[in-house]
Amino acid sequence: MENLQQIHIDGKEYYIIDSIQNLRAEDSFIYNKNKLAMFDGAGEARKYVGSYIGSNGSRLSDFFAYTRWGDTKIAGKRSYPTIQQGNCFFSKTNLLKYLFDARVEYQQQEQIYHNDISQYYDDYLHTINSLSSDLNFFSIYDVSDFLENKLSRAYIRSDDDIWKIWRKIVLPKISYLSILKLIPIKINNGNTQPLFYFRIFLDYQFRSIVHPQLTQSIIQPSSTESKVAERSYNRRIGADMFRKKVIEHMPQCPFSKISEEKLLIASHIKPYNICIKEGQEDQAIDYLNGLALTPTYDKLFDQGYITFTDKGHLICGTQLSAYTWEKLNINPNAKSKMRIYPEDREPYLDYHRRFVFQDNIDDFV
């Protein structure tokens, strides 16, 4: 158990004993107001979680401790057997973070929807803010294809209000569901019943910190061609100086120990686009706003799978498997102090923890 990743939920500590990641939010599942223009229909309330036959079926059965997938007919009629009773939950914190990440897509819409979804954003935000508890529990039941259906698709559904809420706020194709299976580190009253933590995330390129519309808005339409070219040239010079100073200050990737300059990336802590959008060009080229990392670890940091404390301790998120962490040569429980020279980087690191890191930082610190 000690090798399992740990997480804090509502003041209690849990082991993450298993997870299902990257369950795409299909348009067929989406509440009708948020559906893409290319699709028709009102959407269905059941969520596809994979095939229930073969190795994937065995994994689903083990994960949910449920083996009746598709075997739900009684006297020739569909029944709705419970998979988990009252021990699944969404967190208000995660739902708010999702809406924060999705706000540019809601307001400026890179995808083409049936409706102007910006008109719904404030109502959805109010709905989540009005939830009385951070943890919102619900039950799930089996609405899978019947056994005689060769597609053998496993579906789950809930009739609880929080299920209806997440269907309303989630955006199709660019969102995905993650489910963590948790058991408490300290067992009280012999209760070892697992909890299932449902979370929703947005594809990296559609998050508000890097959204395509954010990038386009940096270049103002009124700018003349010569001004755009001049600004582009100045920023390129600034980027070269930024990289040079970052690597001078931090000449080695703290993960791979590689110091070959050709292989190092000057990775922004507070994203470049955000600095420019806020009119903080000095932050965009401040070497203290950069870490020297080799490409794999740059990707982990840039897309919010890892972050750091103000003292330089590594914090690993919960969206990668134990197998992946092992291959990366990272122990997600170690909280290792990395050589990132954190002094005077605190404001940038704080921004990264709050807005770039994909998990809720309070679940770890």
Where are these regions (language model features)?
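Short, flexible coil/linker elements and helix-boundary hinge sites characteristic
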Residues: 111, 129, 215-216, 246, ...
